[in-house]
Amino acid sequence: MKILIDENMPYAAELFSELGEVIAKSGRTLTADDLIDVDALMIRSVTKVNSELLSKANKLSFVGTATAGMDHVNQALLKNKGVFFTAAPGCNKVGVAEYVLSCVMVLAQQHGFSIFDKTFGIIGAGQVGSYLAQCLDALSIPYLLNDPIKEQEGDTRSFVSLDELLEKSDVISLHTPITRDGNFPTHHLIGQERLLTLRHDQILINAARGPVVDNDALKNRLLIQDGFKAVLDVFEFEPEVDIALLPLLSFATPHIAGYGLEGKARGTTMIFNSFCEFLQREERADPQNLLPVAPIPNVTLNQQWDHSTLHNLIQLVYDVRKDDAVFRKEISTIGAFDNMRKDYWDRREYSAITITGNKDCGLTPLKQLGFTIEEV
């Protein structure tokens, strides 16, 4: 059995080699010829699964994407061909939420405001948006939710309209898929008209899909230079990036918000376990068994944590300025966007750090935020 994997999928080679012959290739440059005699295909979001790619897939029976998003896969086509499909919903939710928190924490430090004085607006209440809301709940930070599809489906959470969210939120965080059809398309959801309504003191963060925000309109909005801030982890035409947009952004990164090592391990193991079930094999993988010890695995608190402590803990795990600096330095070189993703460092999640302290340190919110807690 031949299993074709994306060469940038962590732990995939060692796991899938238990099941068959593994062939590793660049996901963005896969061609139809690569799928000849291949039984299973394991991809990431850079691979477009369409009729062209599958035109010579004479043995393909299984496709797995180690990503939460699925807009790069023509699922109807796979179904018509009798090919089983699976994804990894929620695998990156922790990393994306921690990315957003890092961005806002750094901006708070740079511009002299407190994250606790802000209201967040979360657009898209799926796995990622819901986890971000959970983090904000842990810190008692208010937020508004917008997700008309969830609302129509009977989700009992309190939702507001998009226009109300844009009006009342200080930090607007996007967590929708990219859709062009249906009652609530998200392509250019944040376009020129809505961008011009945003206040000078608002922050827009897109860690969802690039085309959810009209990048040309965003550039024009930022050129007003009234204090409005924007952070992009995704770009409308990535891997191509509008270089003229970069100086206007507070932070810019190459689609790595969900690239924590834990998240990537979860994505790989989720599709590995699904493939084992498909094959009726007993093998199962636990992402925790794959992860190395964090560079700084332990932190001790001697007193009640405060805003400064929280800022330091969050930046200890992940400081967005590191990725932003690399992005701005490298992006003008050929292939930089994909190379930065391919060579991305082993970023960890809060759970990789154990915080030790006594009951007077008030550790419960930190535990709810995701840190591992050891009370003494």
From Swiss-Prot:
Annotated protein name in UniProt: Erythronate-4-phosphate dehydrogenase
Subcellular localization: Cytoplasm
Claim: Oxidoreductase is one of the keywords in the record: yes
Cross-referenced CDD domains: ErythrP_dh
Gene3D superfamilies, A to Z: 3.30.1370.170, NAD(P)-binding Rossmann-like Domain
UniProt record, GO biological process: pyridoxine biosynthetic process
Residues bound to substrate: 45, 67, 259
UniProt-listed PROSITE patterns: D_2_HYDROXYACID_DH_3
